[in-house]
A protein has these predicted regions:
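Extracellular/periplasm-exposed beta-strand and loop segments of Gram-negative cell-envelope proteins
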Residues: 80-105, 127-161, 192-223, 251, ...
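Short loop/turn motifs that connect adjacent beta-strands in outer-membrane beta-barrel proteins
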Residues: 58-66, 118, 171-181, 236-240, ...
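Transmembrane beta-strand segments that form the barrel wall of outer-membrane beta-barrel proteins
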Residues: 240-255, 279
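Predominantly the C-terminal beta-signal and adjacent terminal strand-loop region
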Residues: 260-312
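Residues on the lipid-exposed face of transmembrane beta-strands in outer-membrane beta-barrel proteins
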Residues: 72, 109-113, 164-168, 186-188, ...
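Outer-membrane beta-barrel pore domains and translocons
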Residues: 73-77, 126-128, 169, 187-191, ...
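Short glycine/proline- and aromatic-enriched beta-strand/turn motifs that initiate or cap beta-hairpins
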Residues: 29-124, 306-308
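Residues that define the transmembrane beta-barrel architecture of outer-membrane proteins
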Residues: 66-68, 103-107, 158-162, 180, ...
Length: 312
């Protein structure tokens, strides 16, 4: 009986302990779950993420003329070549004559290819041709043909220039949003001039032996030179910019070359209208029998096309 009472008392104690300790632990679990649930953000009412900003072409890509482009120009220059007697002349008669006349409007073309982020390779070409009718002030030998003093000449010439220029952005650095850029120009140029002379009033003349007298002459002078210079462009407004450049090179008693230009450029869509002034000067080497030199200033207009504008 005593053992039965002890067993009953032990069972009652275990049950009482389970009630006092086990039930609160079970009651606390929903509270913890409720606390975890209240910390989760409500899915309703969340703002949608903002749209990605549109891609913008910066001023350094196209507005400053650095994108790939093709330009056609029309140059209204004036001036004419003149021939001088070179140091290599040993025949005792000069080779001096002023071509006279006005040049025809000169077509020109430029291809610009980006090299790196802000630099460009520019390949340009122009052609000037003209006619003149000078009268020789003295007896002369021109390209091996003898002319008399007072001879009336018909002169025709064609001058061409091809230039490859590496335009390197030198200031500012880093570029960021600068509207003003300065570039150093590293160039190589090929220049040639072909000239023909004729004395039309002496056609049909013969010498003492009855042989016809040659009264026409033809010659070509050319040279390849490096040239160095500076270029600048300024973004006046979103579609309007100013551009200028100048370069040249000379050796003492050798050939000389320089050119300069300044223009205002208005962009619309993939095109840009140009208007400005430019000048070009060259002189072939005076170490030869004869040399030719000329300076051509004038105004020009142009149309520039950016085929890849808007694709970036």
């Amino acid at each position: 009986m005593r053992n039965a009472l002890k067993t009953a008392a032990w069972i009652a104690g275990v049950c009482l302990g389970f009630v006092l300790h086990g039930q609160p632990a079970a009651a606390q679990q929903p509270a913890a779950q409720q606390q975890t649930t209240t910390q989760q953000p409500a899915p309703a009412g969340q703002p949608s993420p903002p749209p990605a900003p549109p891609q913008v072409v910066t001023a350094g890509d196209f507005y400053a003329g650095d994108g790939i482009s093709i330009t056609a120009q029309y140059w209204l220059g004036y001036g004419h070549p003149s021939m001088g007697t070179g140091h290599g002349n040993g025949n005792g008669e000069p080779s001096s004559v002023d071509y006279l006349g006005k040049p025809r409007p000169a077509p020109a073309g430029i291809i610009s290819i980006p090299v790196g982020k802000h630099n460009a390779l520019r390949i340009s070409y122009f052609r000037i041709q003209g006619n003149g009718n000078p009268t020789l002030p003295a007896a002369s030998i021109i390209y091996g043909t003898s002319y008399n003093q007072g001879d009336y000449l018909a002169v025709h010439y064609v001058m061409q220039n091809v230039k490859a220029s590496f335009d390197y952005l030198s200031w500012p650095f880093p570029v960021k949003d600068s509207k003003f850029h300065i570039k150093t120009l590293w160039e190589v140029q090929y220049t040639n001039i072909a000239s023909s002379f004729d004395a039309p009033l002496r056609h049909g003349q013969t010498d003492a032996s009855g042989a016809p007298i040659i009264v026409s002459a033809y010659g070509k002078d050319w040279f390849i030179y490096p040239s160095f210079g500076l270029g600048a462009d300024y973004l006046i407004s979103h579609n309007f910019r100013f551009e200028a450049r100048a370069s040249g090179f000379a050796f003492p008693h050798r050939a000389t070359i320089w050119d300069t230009e300044a223009s205002l450029n208005y962009r619309f869509g993939k095109f840009e209208i140009q208007g400005g002034v430019k000048a070009f000067h060259f002189k072939t080497s005076p170490e030869k029998v004869e040399f030719v030199q000329a300076t051509y200033p004038g105004a020009f207009v142009g149309l520039r096309w950016y085929p890849e504008y808007g694709k970036r």
